[in-house]
Amino acid sequence: GPKCPFNTDTVSMIIETRENRNRDLYTLQTLQNHPEFKEKTITRPVVFITHGFTSSASETNFINLSKALVDKDNYMVISIDWQTAACTNEAAGLKYLYYPTAASNTRLVGQYIATITQKLVKQYKISMANIRLIGHSLGAHVSGFAGKKVQELKLGKYSEIIGLDPAGPSFSSNKCSDRLCETDAEYVQILHTSNHLGTERILGTVDFYMNNGKNQPGCGRFFTEVCSHSRAVIYMAECIKHECCLIGIPKSKSSQPISSCTKQECVCVGLNAKKYPSRGSFYVPVESTAPFCNNKGKII
């Protein structure tokens, strides 16, 4: 059969809330069995997390990200598991041959998220202002396609999309309609952590270049790219746990120390980024070990 097929049978959701932390798997058909979906309305804010190529929603970094969100702000976290369509289950040495297939599946997975969103908005009365999408690598583009589709469906825009080192190959030279783009949500936040698996291209409302967007400190000499690529997920989880611990300085002022930052020109990476007025590209110096903080006690 075709490799890495996408259909509604090959994608599932892991739902985590404070009351239900058992990370059970749901499909579109079984969603109404989740306690939260037995209610008439859902009042808490929702975050969708989407993994990338050859990954899954059960990878440690995504479990930690989900946990950080639920602990911090009482979100309902819906982790999209599209591992079959992301070629995770293909023979180890052959996975990379199927990258173009996984890349082309991103639009379908995005439309799937839009379908769930439509249900949340129409049936459960959730406001689009209360829905955020966080996607890593190919999952960042999935989130972008979801953002385009909900606008087509006249639902409005998601409040925010956070692209964690959006995939470069197959996407970086695409026009806005064929990749994650700053018009896909009210606010699009990008973390750049690798320049081969990711991309240096400006994609968002704010683009954070972590350690210049290239090799991340502490990633060593071997498998540096893969390590750097996944660091974006780890940084975001840390930024949720420790508010304002990573501060971005405008690229035009990147020679200045973080200590010179003001609320007007610098921006904190994470869920509060959009509260800061500054837009554009930012340089973020990063430590080599968790929690990676660069603020040295400074809070802007």
Curated annotation (Swiss-Prot):
Keyword Magnesium assigned to the entry: answer is: no
Expressing tissues: Expressed by the venom gland.
Its GO CC terms? extracellular space
Which Pfam family is one of those matched by this entry? Lipase
Cross-referenced InterPro entries, in alphabetical order? AB_hydrolase_fold (IPR029058), Allerg_PlipaseA1 (IPR002334), Lipase (IPR013818), Lipase_N (IPR033906), TAG_lipase (IPR000734)
Q: Catalysed reaction(s)?
A: a 1,2-diacyl-sn-glycero-3-phosphocholine + H2O = a 2-acyl-sn-glycero-3-phosphocholine + a fatty acid + H(+)
Function, as annotated: Catalyzes the hydrolysis of phosphatidylcholine with phospholipase A1 activity. May act as an allergen and induce hemolytic activity.
The name under which this protein is listed is Phospholipase A1
Which organism is the protein's source?
A: Vespula germanica
Lineage of the species this protein comes from? Eukaryota, Metazoa, Ecdysozoa, Arthropoda, Hexapoda
